[in-house]
Structure formats: structure tokens, C-alpha cells
Regions:
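Short coil/linker segments at helix-helix boundaries
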Residues: 30-38, 63-97, 104-142, 152-190, ...
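Terminal, low-structured helical/coil segments at or just beyond the last alpha-helical repeat
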Residues: 163-169, 177, 194-195, 199, ...
């Protein structure tokens, strides 16, 4: 045990000795290899040197979301989503004018809506998704991920349960209704800007299905199956898309 502790301290010390740019490059390489836990360690090492390094904070929010999406049990999913949210908040506090900071705040807020039992908090998360998504699109209209999260918000508002809609009305007097045409428009724009974003294809296929356009849903979900896996959660999302596709054929 003592040996392992010393080895761990040596490892951390060696990481801290490396330049931030080198650590980020190594972390990005690990991401390309779908080694998210290892990449997370390097981004955390960046924060040991620069606690407000926005790029690292945003990456940590995204990578913990990937871990949540691959987790089997609900407890682990919630923990990873909460961790992602914490890093997103730090990123936004460090630089609220970075489009990536607003994007990860919208993403992380949306992830927590299904894991929150307090109605007031659910509504706050729903409102935050729209606020930060709008802010991200305003900062950079051609940031594909921002278009995706805004489109997903529109879709989710259409699909919002009666219970959650009642909570929204109770605490805030309601929110704008979701619009499937707007959801599809945003996600189609994301598809142009981020042609390999698996989650966008999956939700776009769902939106077309909900909008009673099975032909387009089949087209999108078929293309989804041909996309490369760019993170460990992509294979799971593609499998979900394949199941949905099977119901349409």
C-alpha cells in the first residue's frame, strides 16, 4: 500500500511537471483512442497548474457526461452527471464569454433533469438549458454543439411529461412550448457543422419520427449507423438508434 501511494504521488508529480499544452495534447490523443478515464486524469493535471483553464474544465464536463452515458447503474450515472455539472459551472465562472462554457452548462443542466426529484430544481434546470443554449448560439451561431443542445431543448419540451409541465407552470407560470420544426432546424444545422456527432443524429431521428416523417427518420437513423465512434458512448447511442430504426422499417 505504501508503495502504491508513493507511486501515485510520483505519477501526479510527473504530470504537474509537464507543460499545460503538452498535457492537453496527450489528453486529446487519449480521447481519440476512446480512453476517457485516462484523458480525464490529464485534464485534471492541467487544473493542478491552472485551476481556471477553461478548455480543460469544458473537456472534463464533456468527458464525465460520456462516462455517465456509458454507466450501467443509475447511481453512477447521477454522480457522473453531477460531476460534469460542477466542472461546467467552473468553466462558466472562469469565462462566461466562451461559447464552450455556455454549451457545457446547457448540456450539463439538461442531463440532470431526469435525476432530480425536487420540482423546483427540475424547472430551474429546464430554464437553464434554454438560457445557456441561447447564449451559446448568440455567442457563436455556427457552433454546432450549441445548435444541437438548443434543438434538443425544443424536442424535449414537446416530449415533456404532463407532470413536469405542471411543475413548470406552478413555479414559473410556464415556459415557451417546444417546437418540432425548430428542433429539427437546429439539429439539421448541427449536422452541417458537426457531421459526425452521433447524439445529434439520434435525437434528429427521434424528432423526425415525432414529427410524423418516418422516411426522413429512417434516412437519418441509417446514416447514424455508419458514423465512426468518437467516444465510448457513441456505440451505445448507435445501438439505440438501430432499435428505433427497426421499428420504422
Amino acid at each position: 500500500m505504501k508503495y502504491l501511494c508513493l507511486l501515485s504521488l510520483f505519477f501526479i508529480g510527473s504530470l504537474r511537471a509537464q507543460p499545460v499544452n503538452t498535457l492537453i495534447q496527450q489528453a486529446e490523443q487519449l480521447e481519440r483512442q476512446l480512453k476517457e478515464p485516462e484523458a480525464i486524469k490529464l485534464y485534471q493535471a492541467v487544473l493542478l497548474q491552472e485551476p481556471a483553464q477553461v478548455a480543460a474544465l469544458c473537456k472534463l464536463a464533456e468527458l464525465h457526461t460520456v462516462l455517465a452515458n456509458t454507466a450501467v447503474d443509475k447511481k453512477t450515472k447521477k454522480l457522473m452527471y453531477e460531476t460534469a455539472y460542477a466542472f461546467a459551472k467552473r468553466a462558466y465562472a472562469a469565462d462566461s464569454n466562451r461559447v464552450e462554457s455556455s454549451y457545457v452548462m446547457a448540456m450539463a443542466s439538461g442531463n440532470l433533469t431526469d435525476f432530480e426529484s425536487d420540482n423546483r430544481k427540475i424547472v430551474e434546470y429546464v430554464r437553464d438549458v434554454r438560457y445557456y443554449a441561447d447564449r451559446a448560439v448568440t455567442l457563436q451561431p455556427n457552433y454546432g454543439k450549441a445548435q444541437y443542445v438548443l434543438g434538443k431543448w425544443q424536442y424535449e419540451m414537446v416530449k415533456l411529461s404532463v407532470f413536469k409541465k405542471a411543475a413548470v407552470k406552478l413555479f414559473y407560470g410556464g415556459l415557451p412550448e417546444g417546437n418540432l420544426d425548430m428542433a429539427i432546424a437546429c439539429m439539421e444545422k448541427c449536422r452541417q457543422l458537426e457531421p459526425y456527432m452521433v447524439s445529434n443524429y439520434l435525437d434528429l431521428g427521434r424528432a423526425y419520427k415525432e414529427n410524423r416523417n418516418p422516411t426522413k427518420a429512417i434516412e437519418i437513423l441509417t446514416r447514424l449507423q455508419k458514423l465512426p465512434n468518437r467516444n465510448s458512448a457513441d456505440a451505445i447511442m448507435k445501438a439505440t438508434g438501430a432499435e428505433l430504426l427497426a421499428t420504422l422499417q
